[in-house]
Amino acid sequence: MSNLRGTNRFILVAVLVSFVFLSIMNAEARKEIGYPKQRFGEDRTNPYEEITPPLIGGCDPKNPQTCLPKQPANPYRRGCLKITRCQRDV
């Protein structure tokens, strides 16, 4: 009879420990569930809020003074070759 009581106590403790473990895991998982931030400093608490596209290069059509100067798409230039002796400008 005492062996049965010890087994019941062991099962009760095991179930209690597993419930505590699962509740801790659920608390940690709640931190990750939600809408991720798309940009730095964005608050995504309202998922139906209108999302404006990020300004590319900090350029605003209303304030063209904030636009950065345009750069060539590929500024790479080939170096001097022995055969041309750096005489041509590409």
Swiss-Prot record:
Residues 1-29 form the signal peptide. Keywords: Disulfide bond, Hormone, Secreted, Signal. This is Protein RALF-like 3. The keyword Signal applies. The keyword Secreted applies. Belongs to the plant rapid alkalinization factor (RALF) family. It is found in: Secreted. It comes from the Eukaryota. GO terms for molecular function: hormone activity. Cell signaling peptide that may regulate plant stress, growth, and development. Mediates a rapid alkalinization of extracellular space by mediating a transient increase in the cytoplasmic Ca(2+) concentration leading to a calcium-dependent signaling events through a cell surface receptor and a concomitant activation of some intracellular mitogen-activated protein kinases. One of its GO terms (cellular component) is apoplast. It comes from Arabidopsis thaliana. Disulfide bonds join C59-C67, C80-C86. GO terms for biological process: calcium-mediated signaling; cell-cell signaling; regulation of growth.
